[in-house]
A protein has these predicted regions:
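Hydrophobic/aromatic beta-strand patches that form the interior of the parallel beta-sheet core
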Residues: 15, 98, 126-128
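Short beta-strand-loop-alpha-helix junction that forms the active-site gateway
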Residues: 100-108
């Protein structure tokens, strides 16, 4: 599958290539010392939505493997919201879909709907999080630290 054929240059996401700078920018307006921020980050007690951070880290890992970044959004019927799959990577004539979650696996409606909608084009679908490896139906649950091995 050629993902470059479906590029939409009017829709894009921006990621920072320096994750340390990204974390600093996330908390630049808060009166907390740098060491306190990183201690809370490491202990998973940071008062923030870390989804952006984990998605940024994932983007960094994927580009470091030499891959281009692709994602997919589509309208959720009967709603003003959209579904979004964080990353798509081609594998031969199929694609691998990745959904990144900062905490547990929680809700993952987008990747499930993507798998239902595009099942014949999908090789593997991954939910990347801090949790242990596992499987839920056709969805592979993988810990965040394994992402570089899944995209090479």
């Amino acid at each position: 599958v050629s993902l470059t054929d479906t590029k939409d240059f009017d829709s894009y996401k921006l990621y920072l290539s320096d994750t340390g700078l990204f974390v600093t920018l996330m908390f630049i307006d808060r009166p907390v010392t740098e060491n306190d921020i990183y201690a809370k980050l490491l202990s998973d007690k940071l008062p923030a939505n870390l989804g952006y951070l984990y998605e940024n880290l994932s983007a960094q890992m994927i580009t470091a493997s030499g891959r281009e970044l692709y994602y997919h959004t589509w309208e959720k019927k009967g709603s003003t919201h959209y579904y979004e799959v964080d990353f798509l990577i081609s594998e031969g004539s199929k694609i691998n879909a990745f959904e990144v979650k900062s905490s547990g696996s929680g809700k993952h409606e987008s990747i499930r709907e993507f798998c239902r909608k595009f099942s014949r084009n999908i090789s593997k679908a991954y939910l990347i999080s801090q949790k242990d490896a596992g499987k839920e139906e056709n969805l592979l649950l993988e810990p965040f630290y394994l992402l570089p091995f899944l995209v090479k």
